[in-house]
Amino acid sequence: MNKVVLLCRPGFEKECAAEITDKAGQREIFGFARVKENSGYVIYECYQPDDGDKLIRELPFSSLIFARQWFVVGELLQHLPPEDRITPIVGMLQGVVEKGGELRVEVADTNESKELLKFCRKFTVPLRAALRDAGVLANYETPKRPVVHVFFIAPGCCYTGYSYSNNNSPFYMGIPRLKFPAEAPSRSTLKLEEAFHVFIPADEWDERLANGMWAVDLGACPGGWTYQLVKRNMWVYSVDNGPMAQSLMDTGQVTWLREDGFKFRPTRSNISWMVCDMVEKPAKVAALMAQWLVNGWCRETIFNLKLPMKKRYEEVSHNLAYIQAQLDEHGINAQIQARQLYHDREEVTVHVRRIWAAVGGRRDER
């Protein structure tokens, strides 16, 4: 199995292909990407037969920006007979996966695939039973075993394969299912909520998104991102010349500062989070974020970088490299992740966490 399917946002196939070609090449896993515009997926075909498996084992999925999900597959199954689609699929997976922990029958995230998605949901139940009988799936779902993927690109036409549960997206089609809260001031609130799900392990939420933390929201108006912080019982400085939603001000947890987010300087020394979703050139935002991190004005940050029309992967890579270089120059240890989230449009969301080492004679924090 030498092919890797990567699901992405429709319209960003070229960026997804450029990224996987670059990052696979850095690990000396060479191949080429097959790209069909607005299809919502990319196929990276490795030159060596076992390199697909090697790629999804060795390259951290968390290091990918434009891929929502990935899995290794074999040859395309075509012209599945309508009276028995199950037998050929089971045959393709036997000897490839043994006692898989979960089955996902998926499609790309396009308008054309919506009808096909309905079929996938109905088809999952009988296929799961057949795969269990064949030993491809375990008799019960387990998160420690590989995930079996059946990816339909057209009716009667699918790829079959697997991903590793410790190096993939835990979400079906790579998309967290989030509900827009009616009391939130704007739909942008879902970007920050999704970022928390993607970047912060669920078992660390109580510690890292804790009650009583202090946070700053730069470019906050009308308060979509502030809402997520308030919902987690944080105290928030919302920085924007534009007005904040009255519902947020009524909580008593929000201090509205009518200032330019680029000029604001915090006066507190215990700010846990800084978040930022400003419409500005990505290089300018990256420079501001680096300044906050280098000066230790926050422990963690989530921010958006708006993408240009062309060379989007190159632009994001350049901005992330700039932030990393600034941190390195000042001897700061940090973890950087970036992802084009489901709720992002022409942008990517970045998470940076400063990590303080325990050094004798020095406080752990700042």
Curated annotation (Swiss-Prot):
Subcellular location: Cytoplasm
Ligand binding (S-adenosyl-L-methionine): 188, 221-224, 240, 260, 277
GO (cellular component) term, any one: cytoplasm
Group of enzyme by EC: transferase
Catalytic activity reported: cytidine(2498) in 23S rRNA + S-adenosyl-L-methionine = 2'-O-methylcytidine(2498) in 23S rRNA + S-adenosyl-L-homocysteine + H(+)
One Pfam entry name: RLMM_N
Keyword hit for rRNA processing: yes
One GO biological process term: rRNA processing
Active site: 306
The entry's keywords: Cytoplasm, Methyltransferase, rRNA processing, S-adenosyl-L-methionine, Transferase
GO terms for MF: S-adenosylmethionine-dependent methyltransferase activity
Classification via InterPro entries: RlmM_FDX (IPR040739), RlmM_THUMP-like (IPR048646), RNA_MeTrfase_FtsJ_dom (IPR002877), rRNA_MeTrfase_M (IPR011224), SAM-dependent_MTases_sf (IPR029063)
Taxonomic superkingdom: Bacteria
Annotated EC: 2.1.1.186
Keyword Acetylation appears in the UniProt entry: no
Subunit structure: Monomer.
Function, as annotated: Catalyzes the 2'-O-methylation at nucleotide C2498 in 23S rRNA.
Family: Belongs to the class I-like SAM-binding methyltransferase superfamily. RNA methyltransferase RlmE family. RlmM subfamily.
The protein's name: Ribosomal RNA large subunit methyltransferase M
Organism: Shigella boydii serotype 4 (strain Sb227)
